[in-house]
């Protein structure tokens, strides 16, 4: 039997066949379990032109005790790396070869060892690797801050002898051409008091080129259901709009169509919303409602109006404190659980403030003497507004 420990190489030795009485026709080795670690990196995938990146989907099987990490990155050229050459002038190094051309992998490999100064990620033209996707889901949005032409995928496998992981397939959706070459956006103000309704202005600047599809709908993510959309302005002038959706995930509005005739025109969306967590991200997307199957194009954070000192879609808290629970109230303040259908339940409403990630939340009731009545809720929650109901019965 082979040893149970993982092995990489195996030496097979047979005595010299001096009399020619035997020969080897086939040689097979069988082992148990899975390779402890393996990694797959795809070739750079050329989409043929800039495209809006949509959903990444997969089929995965991961045994208990094993781990599979799937990630992706996107860029603007066909090589995600930068190659450096020593100039031998002190510690100076350059990305150019001796003829002044930007080096490629091929030209880098032709250098003498002493000339090779290393390979680094190309952060100018490529985004970094995404965080690993949660494979318990079947799909998730591709992580890219704007339309890109090139995509690369990576999968890392960590296994034990008895547990392994498998990827059946990985696929992704794109729309080409995109609805816009680029849609930049920033939000103001960038600081707000925790849990209080604040009016925000979401500024967008579309960059439209020939062939872009155009868009007529804006989708903005919010930490809770907003109070409402107060105004939409094109170049400072109010325009008509329709609210298509408002819920706990955000809102969507229909606006006058944006195409090449509105290239570089400032769009403002004014809405009111509370913020519960430092660094709340108001991400957004634009799309063409007449083509619902196309990818919704992500909005890129950046400078839109030089008079607005933001350049971000993130909002912080102006009154950081150690309090985690805010705005606790009972609705109605008094209730009568007598079964007549009127005020038979009380709704316990509260805000969770500045919670990092997800936390375990427990709602426990006590009487006026401090005696425990019971637990009415237990479960994970993030920063935001929450409510739970109690029917007046001991739990």
Name every feature range the model reports, one short phrase each.
Residues 317-395:
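Short loop/turn motifs at secondary-structure boundaries
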Residues 1-323, 336:
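Beta-strand-rich ligand- or partner-binding modules
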């Amino acid at each position: 039997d082979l040893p149970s420990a993982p092995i990489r190489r195996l030496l097979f030795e047979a005595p010299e066949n001096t009399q020619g009485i035997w020969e080897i026709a086939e040689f097979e080795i069988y082992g148990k379990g899975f390779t402890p670690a393996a990694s797959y990196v795809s070739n750079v995938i050329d989409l043929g032109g800039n495209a809006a990146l949509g959903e990444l989907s997969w089929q995965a099987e991961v045994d208990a005790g094993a781990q599979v990490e799937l990630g992706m990155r996107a860029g603007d050229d066909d090589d995600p790396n930068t190659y450096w050459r020593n100039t031998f002038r002190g510690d100076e190094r350059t990305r150019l070869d001796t003829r002044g051309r930007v080096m490629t992998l091929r030209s880098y490999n032709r250098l003498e060892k002493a000339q090779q100064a290393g390979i680094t990620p190309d952060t100018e033209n490529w985004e970094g690797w995404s965080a690993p996707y949660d494979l318990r889901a079947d799909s998730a949005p591709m992580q890219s801050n704007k339309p890109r032409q090139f995509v690369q995928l990576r999968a890392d496998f960590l296994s034990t002898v008895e547990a392994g992981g498998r990827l059946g397939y990985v696929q992704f959706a794109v729309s080409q051409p995109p609805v816009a070459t680029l849609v930049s956006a920033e939000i103001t103000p960038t600081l707000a008091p925790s849990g209080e309704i604040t009016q925000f202005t979401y500024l967008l600047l579309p960059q439209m080129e020939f062939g872009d599809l155009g868009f007529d709908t804006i989708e903005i993510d919010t930490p809770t259901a907003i109070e409402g959309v107060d105004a939409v302005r094109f170049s400072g002038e109010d325009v008509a709009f329709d609210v298509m959706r408002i819920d706990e995930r955000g809102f969507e509005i229909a606006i006058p169509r944006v195409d090449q005739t509105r290239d570089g025109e400032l769009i403002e969306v004014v809405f009111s919303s509370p913020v519960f967590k430092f660094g709340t991200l108001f991400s957004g997307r634009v799309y063409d409602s007449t083509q619902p199957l196309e990818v919704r194009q992500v909005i890129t954070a950046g400078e839109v109006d030089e008079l607005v000192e933001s350049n971000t879609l993130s909002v912080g808290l102006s009154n950081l404190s150690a309090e985690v629970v805010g705005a606790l109230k009972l609705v109605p303040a008094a209730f009568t659980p007598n079964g007549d259908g009127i005020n038979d339940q009380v709704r316990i409403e509260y805000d969770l403030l500045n919670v990092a990630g997800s936390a375990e939340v427990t709602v426990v009731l006590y009487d006026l003497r401090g005696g425990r009545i019971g637990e009415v809720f237990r479960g994970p929650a993030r920063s935001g507004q929450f409510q739970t109901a109690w029917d007046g019965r001991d739990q």
